[in-house]
């Protein structure tokens, strides 16, 4: 079944480039940039991946991202991910990148962007992997900080398909960012946002009504609100669900409890994604395979999930 799932044409719509930084590349970049790491070797770092919640993961994620310093570093990070896409027949990807993770460390916005977009361009010409880049604001920072990031992005407007919202969800509702999302839409950006991962269904309502998003990232807690579920079904609003991430971060205690197939059978346009695959133990095919192993996902369900991902692209072929 793994090989069949791997060969299935699919899109990935929820992937943080910084979260695809594998331990081996992290150590290689640290050596290249002469950065001391708190882990002795790759295995010690892998053991550190036993986090219990979103915040513990984010602390490690931001520490790991510190090795990314130069345009070449960002190119190498993105290229390594695109090679995985090619291996797993991900024919289209819409990755997030978090400028603030890097600009707050003194890395110039244009340095980060040049490395990422250079790799995405080569991914199209050399690997046949299409893409659309999403600029994501960090919700644990202020809306004013997000406004500054949007200002930095505007000279490179054509590099992006959308803006998004990620990082620590609890205590940082979508309403906190209504102004900057209004402005981004006026500048021609499409909009997406993380909502309903750790946060309540109310955050999904806010993302839809205040941020006017085209797609919900995560959204698994929508199932707790029947009126919200009906709206998502009626309007066919896509959800970019990340099963391995959800179990690793204890959104669900184990994969057998995940609700993605229940949502699929109710008519929700759910998709399968890897989120931060270096940290969560698998890329897209591994996520599909986990659904087959633990939830009994059928070939028909897998085809529908893959087709949903292709239908939910912001960048249309």
Curated annotation (Swiss-Prot):
Its EC number is 3.5.4.2. The keyword Hydrolase applies. Keywords: Hydrolase, Metal-binding, Nucleotide metabolism, Zinc. Its cofactor is Zn(2+). Coiled coil: none annotated. GO terms for cellular component: cytosol. InterPro entries: A_deaminase_dom, ADE, Ado/ade_deaminase, Metal_Hydrolase. Binds 1 zinc ion per subunit. GO terms for biological process: adenine catabolic process; hypoxanthine salvage; nucleotide metabolic process. Zn(2+) binds at residues 14, 16, 194, 275. It catalyses: adenine + H2O + H(+) = hypoxanthine + NH4(+). Substrate binds at residue 276. One of its GO terms (molecular function) is adenine deaminase activity. The active site is at 197 (proton donor). The record marks 218 as: Important for catalytic activity. It comes from the Bacteria. It holds the Pfam family A_deaminase. Belongs to the metallo-dependent hydrolases superfamily. Adenosine and AMP deaminases family. Adenine deaminase type 2 subfamily. HAMAP family: Adenine_deaminase (MF_01962). PANTHER family: ADENINE DEAMINASE. Catalyzes the hydrolytic deamination of adenine to hypoxanthine. Plays an important role in the purine salvage pathway and in nitrogen catabolism. This is Adenine deaminase. It comes from Pseudomonas syringae pv. tomato (strain ATCC BAA-871 / DC3000).
